[in-house]
Design a protein with these regions (language model features):
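Conserved ABC ATPase signature
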Residues: 135-139
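ABC ATPase "signature
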Residues: 219-220
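Conserved catalytic motifs of ABC-family nucleotide-binding domains
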Residues: 156
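Conserved ABC ATPase "signature" region
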Residues: 102, 106, 113-131
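Catalytic Walker B motif of ABC-type/P-loop ATPase nucleotide-binding domains
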Residues: 160-163
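Conserved ABC transporter NBD signature motif
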Residues: 62-73, 77-78
Length: 250
């Protein structure tokens, strides 16, 4: 994986809701083709940041560049480059999977031929081919999440934003979705920007930022963060501490 271009650049980004400072002047960048994770508890400012990056929410101040395009100046171009998976699905329970994806393709003025071509590729890579003609509302949680990701991929974006993509899923479904995300990123050199409150999910990323109360508390690779903050220790419980300590001192 070649990481030589900053596809997302954020400088001194701020956002408040009344007296509440949701994002407090953060700075970071994301390398093209990387899997990037925002880790933090609910209310840390992760979703607000994603909404600003995706042009859904206007920042109070600061600067955002997506693939060299500036948010608030080049929003239409930026929207054509990104796909977004929200915490809550935006698809119609009463429509089939294929119908939902076709509706989404209309946002990009996609021709029927292009839609069918993209659908075939996306259905294969996301594993939704077997239930394309089933109603979205009748799918399992894991299947629905796969369709949500397929919706975000219909325009073949350069950057995929995933806001808490596995929340509410059982461990097996979470693993399945994660395997798919990693495969998409590695095989297509796609940049994946993830928010999560699961430590084990963030640990799979190439680079991690830990947010708390609107601020960046720590950042680095998994290895760098472990080296700096984690202390390895072994706890041994014994029935006879005196006997055990004798052998430790030998």
């Amino acid at each position: 994986m070649k990481l030589d271009k900053k596809i997302i650049e954020v400088n001194n980004l701020k956002k408040s809701y009344g007296d509440i400072e949701a994002v407090k002047g953060i700075d970071f960048y994301v390398d093209e083709g990387s899997l990037f994770a925002f880790l933090g508890l609910n209310g840390a400012g992760k979703s607000t940041t994603i909404d600003m990056l995706c042009t859904f929410l206007k920042a109070d101040s600061g600067k955002i560049k997506i693939d060299d395009f500036e948010v608030n100046k080049d929003d239409d171009k930026i929207k054509s480059l990104i796909g977004v998976v929200f915490q809550d699905s935006v698809l119609d329970d009463l429509l089939t999977v294929k119908e939902n994806l076709k509706v989404r393709s209309k946002f990009y003025n996609m021709s029927k031929a292009d839609f069918n071509k993209n659908l075939e590729e996306i259905a294969y890579v996301t594993g939704i081919k077997d239930f394309l003609n089933r109603q979205y509302g009748k799918l399992s949680g894991g299947q629905r999440r796969r369709v949500d990701i397929a919706r975000a991929l219909i325009n073949k974006p350069k950057i995929l934003f995933l806001d808490e993509p596995t929340t509410g899923l059982d461990p097996k479904s979470r693993k399945s979705v994660w395997d798919m995300i990693r495969r998409l990123q590695e095989e297509n050199n796609m940049t994946v920007f993830l928010t999560t409150h699961y430590m084990e999910e963030a640990a799979k990323a190439d680079y991690i930022i830990i947010m708390n109360e609107g601020k960046i508390e720590a950042k680095g690779t998994t290895y760098e963060l472990k080296e700096k903050y984690a202390k390895d220790k072994m706890i041994i419980y014994t029935k006879n501490n005196t006997f055990f300590m004798h052998y430790l001192s030998c």
